[in-house]
UniProtKB/Swiss-Prot annotation:
Organism: Helicobacter pylori (strain ATCC 700392 / 26695) (Campylobacter pylori)
Sample GO molecular function, one term: urease activity
GO BP of this protein: urea catabolic process
Protein name: Urease subunit beta
Reaction(s) the record says it catalyses: urea + 2 H2O + H(+) = hydrogencarbonate + 2 NH4(+)
Summary of subunit composition and partner proteins: Heterohexamer of 3 UreA (alpha) and 3 UreB (beta) subunits. Four heterohexamers assemble to form a 16 nm dodecameric complex.
Binding residues for substrate: H221
CDD domains: Urease_alpha
Protein family membership: Belongs to the metallo-dependent hydrolases superfamily. Urease alpha subunit family.
């Protein structure tokens, strides 16, 4: 067999085992752990290449042959960082490994058979990740959805009804009628969607009715009154219907302090939003719940990474989002109590320790919907620059840290909200919601987004040009966005109760409708690469944060990666 240099090999087939790839302009280095494509048997599409009839493409149609194969992709996932062909069939990932013609090539799996019905997408030199999942969405404007999608987010969970004051402040779609409208509106979009109902009620019947109307869980928010009674009732109903409860706790400590909230939760699983507290929650010590075994703690992206500008920008955001008035002294004091540089500084470190498990946006309500992925990687890079390599790393790479941070916006929010059977990772059997990145633009600008196995968004040149690449090149909607294809390519998530009662038929929905599962039988230990529990305390006078007796903090960055270099205009 003829041998070629590693440099030639990488230029032709992409990086292989032992090769290293820098993510964007960060200091994060991914090393290829394994290559499943088999040297000498690689797939390559194009003139004079191997992916042709009678060679890597079988002549014989079969029930196994793929709809699409992504060749020689570098997969970055919580399951590993490795190179493989990815086979897609019927909108799902059918196989990962060595694809091709099993009659002519060694090592080809039955579920990776290339035939006359197979389309090819060249993954050489590209990184493939699962689509991101943002679990903290205020559905204030529908324009958020394409903005998030272009960033690599393919699933949005939250609540709202548009720019009503309740939605500006809280991620809640309250009541059967509002849920009906939002479930119907979801039909329009290239995005998996799920809606949270109002959990602020000490009445089980009103709570249950919303779940049966299609909500996938509850949001309890202080602006509607996060009382111990509301917490208890929402969790009781959630346990009955197997749905998640998300909470924004009581900043003013009117109905109780953090200890009272934890007593009301009583060891049951709960997803805590913006657990640091600048986005809301018991002042000054809501952050201490992040160390508990039954809490799935999340950040929203305004506070990560911690920079020299973080504190200053929060006051105006808070005033607008929570309908406050700068001329009212008490409103200003309320805002001041939430913006604490000390706890914000600790948040970055808690992410690096795997104590915080999830990142999200808080879209248009103290959060930027298109920056979940970017800010997650900025935080990872900031922490590496400040604290060095993690002790868990093996070899001269950052693979463990990469898996830790990737999990925060992919598999962990999927597990938290009962959708990990469908999305959240690059695994066989899951929906083919995949994001393709050039390594140089990783975390900032995807090359292409595949939705339900079909190309939905891509960087594309002038439509009147003779080839696809001439300027201006920018994101353009592809065919999965249009006609009835969008119904097959996207999912509306509902509760099992609503699914069993035929919510799809009742509301005349054409999209895929799937039920959430296993929301209650999970704990912090189910959070991949982010399952650390600890005893956290906050000094009530200085706001300094201590983990197992040791102070944790970080410095505000005056420069971050993945920033203006990638956004000239």
């Amino acid at each position: 067999m003829k041998k070629i240099s590693r440099k030639e090999y990488v230029s032709m087939y992409g990086p292989t085992t032992g090769d290293k790839v820098r993510l964007g302009d960060t200091d994060l280095i991914a090393e290829v752990e394994h290559d499943y494509t088999i040297y000498g048997e690689e797939l390559k599409f194009g003139g004079g290449k191997t992916l042709r009839e009678g060679m890597s493409q079988s002549n014989n149609p079969s029930k196994e042959e793929l709809d699409l194969i992504i060749t020689n992709a570098l997969i970055v996932d919580y399951t590993g960082i490795y190179k493989a062909d990815i086979g897609i069939k019927d909108g799902k990932i059918a196989g990962i490994g060595k694809g091709g013609n099993k009659d002519m090539q060694d090592g080809v799996k039955n579920n990776l058979s290339v035939g006359p019905a197979t389309e090819a997408l060249a993954g050489e030199g590209l990184i493939v990740t699962a689509g991101g999942i943002d679990t903290h969405i205020h559905f204030i404007s529908p324009q958020q959805i394409p903005t998030a999608f272009a960033s690599g987010v393919t699933t949005m969970i939250g609540g709202g009804t548009g720019p009503a004051d309740g939605t500006n402040a809280t991620t809640i779609t309250p009541g059967r009628r509002n849920l009906k409208w939002m479930l119907r509106a979801a039909e329009e979009y290239s995005m998996n969607l799920g809606f949270l109902a109002k959990g602020n009620a000490s009445n089980d019947a009103s709570l249950a009715d919303q779940i049966e109307a299609g909500a996938i869980g509850f949001k309890i928010h202080e602006d509607w009154g996060t009382t111990p009674s509301a917490i208890n009732h929402a969790l009781d109903v959630a346990d009955k219907y197997d749905v998640q409860v998300a909470i924004h706790t009581d900043t003013l400590n009117e109905a109780g302090c953090v200890e009272d909230t934890m007593a009301a939760i009583a060891g049951r699983t709960m997803h805590t939003f913006h657990t640091e507290g600048a986005g809301g929650g018991h002042a000054p010590d809501i952050i201490k719940v992040a160390g508990e075994h039954n809490i799935l703690p999340a950040s929203t992206n305004p506070t990560i990474p911690f920079t020299v500008n973080t504190e200053a920008e929060h006051m105006d955001m808070l005033m607008v989002c929570h309908h406050l008035d700068k001329s009212i002294k008490e409103d200003v004091q309320f805002a001041d109590s939430r913006i604490r540089p000390q706890t914000i500084a600790a948040e970055d470190t808690l992410h690096d320790m795997g104590i915080f498990s999830i990142t999200s946006s808080d879209s248009q309500a103290m959060g930027r919907v298109g920056e979940v992925i970017t800010r997650t990687w900025q935080t990872a890079d900031k922490n590496k620059k400040e604290f060095g390599r993690l002790k868990e790393e093996k070899g001269d790479n950052d693979n463990f840290r990469i898996k830790r941070y990737l999990s925060k916006y992919t598999i962990n929010p999927a597990i938290a909200h009962g959708i990990s059977e469908y999305v959240g990772s690059v695994e066989v059997g899951k929906v083919a919601d995949l994001v393709l990145w050039s390594p140089a633009f990783f975390g900032v600008k995807p090359n292409m987004i595949i939705k339900g196995g079909f190309i939905a968004l891509s960087q594309m040149g002038d439509a009147n040009a003779s080839i696809p690449t001439p300027q201006p090149v920018y994101y353009r909607e592809m065919f999965a966005h249009h006609g009835k294809a969008k119904y097959d390519a996207n999912i509306t998530f509902v509760s099992q109760a609503a699914y069993d009662k035929g919510i799809k038929e009742e509301l005349g929905l054409e999209r895929q409708v799937l039920p959430v599962k296993n929301c209650r039988n999970i704990t912090k230990k189910d959070m991949q690469f982010n399952d650390t529990t600890a005893h956290i305390e906050v000094n009530p006078e200085t706001y300094h944060v201590f983990v197992d007796g040791k102070e944790v903090t970080s410095k505000p960055a005056n420069k971050v990666s993945l920033a203006q270099l990638f956004s000239i205009f």
